[in-house]
Regions:
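Charged, glycine-rich active-site and insertion segments that engage polyanionic ligands
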Residues: 17-20, 26-179
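Conserved AAA+/SF3 P-loop NTPase catalytic/coupling segment centered on the Walker-B
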Residues: 1-9, 30-32
Length: 179
């Protein structure tokens, strides 16, 4: 709340000697600009191996045994993976049984992205992963790149103009997944 931020600002602006603060922030929520302006920002990205290691420690299980290898990217965060598992557990979805295409189809057909912003963000990441995998295995790289570029523009416009994601995802499914 605003009172807590004001108290934190006062402490940060007038610290005792030899006292340093490390503030850890989740990007899903914004920090007030007045607090952010007094901070040095370090963006930390984990390697794939480190991400898996951290996730395994948090879960107490091996994440690689719970999710199909096609659903992993080098850009997953432990939070992404845990959110994906929580989502799957709530809906009793066995992520080990779904290929990337099958999982994309499931998310779109059941409109899970409408009820959960995290799932919408994961769906967008899975769409990018789909294009990357398709690009890596195809001989017609220009076609895949053009489709990818077209959908990036559509995603950007959907965000920019606050358009409906349903039509975007249905178009992706009909033109790209089934096309």
């Amino acid at each position: 709340n605003i009172n807590a931020v004001n108290a934190l600002l006062k402490i940060v602006e007038e610290p005792n000697e030899n006292i340093f603060f490390i503030l850890i922030h989740n990007n899903e929520k914004s920090i007030l600009s007045t607090l952010r302006s007094r901070c040095l920002t370090f963006k930390i990205n984990l390697s794939f191996t480190k991400c898996i290691e951290v996730t395994n420690k948090l879960l107490g299980k091996n994440i690689l045994d719970l999710i199909n290898h096609e659903l992993f990217t080098n850009y997953n965060t432990p939070g992404d993976l845990i959110n994906l598992l929580d989502f799957a557990n709530e809906r009793k979805i066995n992520l080990k049984k779904y290929s990337l295409v099958e999982f994309l189809t499931l998310l779109i057909d059941n409109s899970y992205y409408k009820k959960n912003k995290t799932i919408k963000d994961l769906l967008l990441n899975f769409i990018e992963l789909f294009f990357l995998k398709k690009y890596n295995i195809t001989d017609n790289k220009n076609s895949v790149f053009n489709n990818y570029h077209e959908f990036l523009l559509k995603i950007n416009n959907t965000n920019k103009f606050n358009l409906d994601y349903e039509s975007l995802f249905l178009e992706f499914k009909s033109k790209i997944l089934n096309g």
